Curated annotation (Swiss-Prot):
Record gene name: infC
Entry similarity comment: Belongs to the IF-3 family.
Lineage top rank: taxon: Bacteria
Biological function: IF-3 binds to the 30S ribosomal subunit and shifts the equilibrium between 70S ribosomes and their 50S and 30S subunits in favor of the free subunits, thus enhancing the availability of 30S subunits on which protein synthesis initiation begins.
Entry protein name: Translation initiation factor IF-3
Organism: Streptococcus thermophilus (strain CNRZ 1066)
Compartments in which it is found: Cytoplasm
Gene Ontology MF terms in the entry: ribosome binding; translation initiation factor activity
Keywords of the record: Cytoplasm, Initiation factor, Protein biosynthesis
GO process terms (BP): ribosome disassembly
Lineage: Bacteria, Bacillati, Bacillota, Bacilli, Lactobacillales
GO cellular component, one term: cytosol
Short name of one Pfam family: IF3_N
InterPro entries (alphabetical): T_IF-3_C_sf (IPR036788), T_IF-3_N_sf (IPR036787), Translation_initiation_fac3_CS (IPR019813), Translation_initiation_fac_3 (IPR001288), Translation_initiation_fac_3_C (IPR019815), Translation_initiation_fac_3_N (IPR019814)
Subunit field text: Monomer.
NCBIfam families, A to Z: infC
Amino acid sequence: MRIIAKKDLFINDEIRVREVRLVGLDGEQMGIKPLSEAQAIADDANVDLVLIQPQATPPVAKIMNYGKFKFEYQKKRKEQRKKQSVVTVKEVRLSPVIDKGDFETKLRNGRKFLEKGNKVKVSIRFKGRMITHKEIGAKVLAEFAEKTQDIAIIEQRAKMDGRQMFMQLAPIPDKK
């Protein structure tokens, strides 16, 4: 069902057409009726007449409880927003000449981020003449990837960008 924004809907007295293709409360087609008759049917049922497709010829109007429709729509939207998960990218910065203890600390932080469901960008910044030894940086990134392979997949392989080498890891999606 296509949901229409409020500014696209015309309700009861806002409808300015001569005749409409009328759809009843339970979705049955009631045929093409003059607007006054459609309005009377809606009033008898104590509900609203809503123009849901003004571009059609003749325009389509539905008899419904607009307040309930709006409430259900907002409830669905809220439910959809709850289901959305916001994935953020966290960054772990390393050095090509990182010490073992520092590496373990950065690795622990990266694992925490991955376990929380965040993506991790692992970057190495080359300073001075270190840029001539890119293979050392690649080795550090490979070791980081190897030690997180049980909880992460490599989303973007190691690549150079100026004086920086980086790769991106993503948590392994749950198999349901």
